[in-house]
């Protein structure tokens, strides 16, 4: 019986090596790469049985983009997202939900690599994967936020003023201030009138939520 072929896409070298070793020990054939460009070359050469994808890979396609493309071209491919992001919308606030056939694991919630392998086996065998969908956790601090609220939270974390946020989103200042206020209320953040406290509080929340804030590339 041939080994099942798994592609691992993870930009952190140590974690990529750890995952690769665990999968090989579990009997999988593994090819691991650190970027979307390298992954694309692998997928063009050979169809994998499964893919374990980090989501935030820097500029260019995300792991979500790759996973959706894989599932569109080969619905039988098992896809497991492995990420620090508690909510996939932080990469693209307007994106939809993760494909129901894919597992979504938060790196912060995994105690060992066996949980990752268990999730992979569950997807491969078309079993119930509800326990491997960390993005659907109702207790997630940002699960209640709308796409617009997620976007303003990211912009506030970058130190942008309310006026700058309004300009970037092409909204009025009053509408922007109201949205920011509703966002903070939803999160239970009491910021008072100190703008420095405001920024620090939001940045701390974003750090805890696993959100990666990047400067614009354009």
Question: What is each model feature region?
Answer:
Residues 12-31:
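Two-component/phosphorelay signaling modules centered on CheY-like receiver
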Residues 20, 32-50:
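Acidic, metal-coordinating helix/loop segments flanking the phosphotransfer/catalytic sites
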Residues 53-70, 86-90:
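Conserved phosphotransfer microenvironments
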Residues 65, 85-106, 111-114:
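Alpha4 helix (beta4-alpha4-beta5 surface) of REC/receiver domains from two-component response regulators
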Residues 115-137:
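The C-terminal output helix
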Residues 129-155:
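Regulatory hinge/linker segments at domain boundaries
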Residues 161-197:
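Recognition helix of helix-turn-helix DNA-binding domains
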Residues 182-218:
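Basic, Lys/Arg-enriched C-terminal extension of HTH/homeodomain DNA-binding domains
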